[in-house]
Amino acid sequence: MSNLQHITIKDNRHLLAEAEIQTHPDLVDAHLRVEAGQIPPGARSLLVDAVLDVPNVPPGTRLEITLPTGDPEMLEKIRNRCHDINTRVAGTSCRLQTTFPRG
């Protein structure tokens, strides 16, 4: 059984970034997307924090994230909160594997 969640980061009702998160008993799969154009600093980090703070996911649960290739803010935020990160580039996306951090 899985659970689907949608997270959005907005500024004055304008969408800046969003994530679709599918949780399974032993895996969380998240797809992060950022709108084209100028995004205020910190919006990407807020999205990553929202994904990593999803409730009812035990620490150590496997986490797979798809994010835009070449997004240093998102990648740095994930590296600050998670350990043992593996990444691979797939076209315009980066596929990242790690585990959920401890609260």
Task: Please place each PLM-identified region on the residue numbering.
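Conserved beta-hairpin
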Residues: 2-18
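Conserved acetyl-CoA-binding loop-helix of GNAT-fold acetyltransferases
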Residues: 40-53, 80
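Conserved active-site alpha-helix within GNAT-family acetyltransferase domains
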Residues: 69-87
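A conserved beta-strand-loop-helix scaffold within acyl/acetyltransferase catalytic domains
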Residues: 13, 19-27, 89
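Short acidic/glycine-enriched loop/turn segments that link adjacent beta-strands
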Residues: 26, 71, 92-94
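Conserved GNAT acetyl-CoA-binding A-motif
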Residues: 55-67
